[in-house]
């Protein structure tokens, strides 16, 4: 199934049913009073998080959703039936944004969580409501209220504790395969991973966390190179970034330069995202002679001026991966405990998360608009070239 992490749709709640003007008519009661019923309420539109839904692909093909209109009232003070609600299911981790105002309508982070995005219109009033001491037979009634209309943007960000970061072919997919049950595609060419992959990592019994593998970045990603920064937003909900560095790239490139390029692209996309804790993993040690491994790794760390946590691994041979898992599990548990025990720390974390969400959203939208503008300019340039080529051609006139 195609992975789609953003969609713009329109939702329209149902209109309320109309009230009616009706009068009681029974045998021996020729002039009964008003008994017009009210109209039914229009159906509303809800969006609900669902664990069994993994992508927003359905909303790329069907973009308009409308709830049912309420039924009109009837005589004998019968209220019309309310319109059926519409419930749209989306993956857990979906943020709902009002396109016009930019306001966040809701953030669905739990299975079954539901948000109303368009409210159904109230039903109209029957003529019973307009009876008075001076007007015993009112013929007045009201029509139903229009249902709410909205254009909304659905943004999916995967929910993970740890996000993998690195160049294409650095071994991120091999690493997540080594430590979890996730089975992303693995090959010897760049951009094997085209969509985010999630894996549950079990450190010990009843101790686990979720790891996310996103497509690799290359230098210039912030300007749209490679797969660009489309998937970087999926790191916005993580607690820790795991920077995977290929110590012996197959293309002969410098691992130090590659690592610095990744950090640079991350800062360009979101300075706040770059403030997340980073754990460095020097991967693919099996590609280096054992006698030279330590010296080469130390050279990389010195050039990077790295002072944070670092691990040496071979995802292919499962060497050093368990140590990384235990370290990450300990760090995640410490963060969870602090948030539960220290309200001030929890408040700061929440503020940081809100700033990070807003920043990544703005950068993603700006990047997409820049990409569309670039594509439009390219198309216009191609059309101009075609026009010029036509002018240079020899004109042939057929005479009968």
UniProtKB/Swiss-Prot annotation:
**Stored SUPFAM superfamilies:** Obg GTP-binding protein N-terminal domain, P-loop containing nucleoside triphosphate hydrolases
Give compartment(s): Cytoplasm
Q: What is its EC number?
A: 3.6.5.-
GO process terms (BP): ribosome biogenesis
Q: Mind telling me which Gene3D superfamilies this protein's record contains? A: GTP1/OBG domain (2.70.210.12), P-loop containing nucleotide triphosphate hydrolases (3.40.50.300)
GO CC annotation, single: cytoplasm
Which coenzyme or cofactor does it need? Answer: Mg(2+)
Q: Which residues bind GTP?
A: 166-173, 191-195, 213-216, 283-286, 314-316
Q: Where is the OBG-type G domain?
A: 160-333
Question: Which GO molecular function annotations are given, in alphabetical order?
Answer: GTP binding; GTPase activity; magnesium ion binding
Task: List UniProt keywords, sorted A-Z.
Answer: Cytoplasm, GTP-binding, Hydrolase, Magnesium, Metal-binding, Nucleotide-binding
Under the heading InterPro entries, the entry gives: G_OBG, GTP-bd, GTP-bd_Obg/CgtA, GTP1-OBG_CS, GTP1_OBG_dom, GTP1_OBG_dom_sf, OBG_GTPase, P-loop_NTPase
Origin superkingdom: Bacteria
Q: Where does Mg(2+) bind?
A: 173, 193
Main localization, broad class? cytoplasm
PROSITE patterns in the record, alphabetically? Answer: G_OBG, GTP1_OBG, OBG
A Pfam family per the record:
GTP1_OBG
Top-level EC class as recorded in UniProt: hydrolase
Taking every annotated instance into account, which residue ranges of this chain make up the domain Obg?
Answer: 1-159
Q: Which NCBIfam families match?
A: Obg_CgtA, PRK12297.1, PRK12299.1
Family, similarity comment: Belongs to the TRAFAC class OBG-HflX-like GTPase superfamily. OBG GTPase family.
Instruction: Provide the assembly information.
Output: Monomer.
Q: What does this protein do?
A: An essential GTPase which binds GTP, GDP and possibly (p)ppGpp with moderate affinity, with high nucleotide exchange rates and a fairly low GTP hydrolysis rate. Plays a role in control of the cell cycle, stress response, ribosome biogenesis and in those bacteria that undergo differentiation, in morphogenesis control.
The protein's name is GTPase Obg
Q: What is the gene name?
A: obg
